[in-house]
Amino acid sequence: MVALYLWPVYHPFIGWPPGRPLNADRPPYWLQVNHHFFFVLYSFVAMGILTVFEWDMFFPDLLDAFVLTTLPIRNSRLFLARVAAIAIFILGFLLDANFLAPLVIPASFDPPNLTRLLAGHILAVLGSGLFSAAFILALQGVLLSLLGERLFRRLSLILQGLTISALLMLLLLFPVLSGAVPVFLQSDSRAVLFFPPFWFLGIYQRILDGPGALPIYTRLTETGCLALLITLGVAGLAYPLAYLSRTRQLVVGSGTQDTRSWAAGPANGLLNATLLRSPVSRAVFHFISQTLMRVQRYRIYLVLYGGVGLSVVVSSILRLSVEHGRVQMEVSADVVRASIAIVAFWTIAGLRMAFVSPGNRQGSWVFRIVHGRPPVAATAIEQLRAARTWVLLWSTLISLSACLGARSIGSAELRSWASTASLMLIALGMCLVLTDVFFFNGMTIAFTGDTPRGQPNLALTVLKYFTFFPFVIWIPVEFELWIARSILHFALAAGVIGAAHFGLDRLHRGMVKEHCGMPGLEDDDEDFPMRLGLRY
């Protein structure tokens, strides 16, 4: 798609690109370099995210130990089969993610030397993606070999979240970074040699420009080739050691450990005495907490959404400007205000994605036996309210922390007490209303819903996010200054938030009562008519 978009940039026609004559020359040199840089960066980010997402699949799990080790297959053959599977997976996705661009680039770029362009493009994007995947695999192997399984498990989620955030930040910051690329590459700073995407951009331009390439491209090419070889070597040496460590841990076992927290007792006691006064709400609330701590799949969802949110926040706040040949960073007050809504939105969206995933239905039989299915309306309301309380508490804690962080890096106008109070009110209101909106149609306890039979409409899902997300960001940017202007405005904003919450809560109660009034299904009943929305 990007290659198709670039066609009118190199071949202008009437009206597009705006303000560019039909007989215009080729784009400036550094603009062409930025176009090449995007493909290198895309391959780097895509392969990195894919490798992080499949982090746990590169090593055997308990099911592999129970099933495969009982077969008459040598351990060395099992190891080589997994290595081959990893290689096929990485190389297959690397080709799949990049094979379309070389088919379109010749027509879009209309290069003077097609052979050099295709050779530079293919080698650069393949090397960039391969380095990204190999680096993450090598990092995982080294840490697992040195730290052991138990300590590695404690750090893996943090590493996954930070890695995804960093990779997405690179991609989202490309429009900002592209303006500074000429300054970086024309400077004599050695910092350029420590940025991996520049290495493979150097390979691209060194092959494309030939002997007339800038000297920096030769240095970047040498650094990139050496780094790729070292990374592949480290991954090849560390993976067998990590594989043996993981296999030994599966056979011997990791032992028992006390997972209780010294701070959980007083916190749970305070919650039970205030927000969770009924046994039903306590059961659901603590069921959610324990399930998230126990099931790896849900934590991966939270890591992915957290990484997306953090990358969007950082890429929105950070601005690079070039003045007098130097790159400077700037922070906009409006973007700092919008970051509060971004954090709240992606936190609650990630929790909803985890809650509706039917990955722990084994625990649903307890609620069904005790309360029935569907339960009486009052019980169902308590169950769903406990889940929303859990989401509200954590999203509020994260959003208020982001609010204080935004205040510390913002301009002087954001550090006044009136502005701080308005930002905190917006953060609390966003968490309250977004929790009501995201969980408005929820009728089941978290993690216990049925597996959907049909595939969701991806286009419709993306459209919902693209239409709702900008509106959420617009609210704090538009109303923060108005709220901070006077106490009356603050009170009016709080009243609007409260009215929206109580209105959504009342509508949700009505939907829950209607749902609970429908006849339930037994295990041996034919449930197809029920899935059509019909009742008999």
Question: Where are the regions a protein language model picked out?
Answer:
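Short helix-loop-helix connector
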Residues: 71-73, 143, 147, 370
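Selective transmembrane-helix segments that form parts of the transport pathway or gating/packing helices
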Residues: 75-104, 374-405
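Residues at alpha-helix boundaries and the short loops/turns that link adjacent helices
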Residues: 133, 279, 357-360, 372-373
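Helix-loop-helix connectors at the membrane interface of multi-pass transporters/channels
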Residues: 144, 362-377
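Nucleic acid-processing catalytic cores of prokaryotic defense/repair systems
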Residues: 5-8, 24, 42-43, 55-58, ...
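Transmembrane helix boundary and interhelical loop/hinge segments in multi-pass membrane proteins
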Residues: 50-71, 351-369
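Transmembrane alpha-helical segments and their membrane-interface loop/helix boundaries
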Residues: 1-48, 96-351, 396-397, 401-536
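Membrane-cytosol interface motif
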Residues: 73-77, 257-264, 372-373
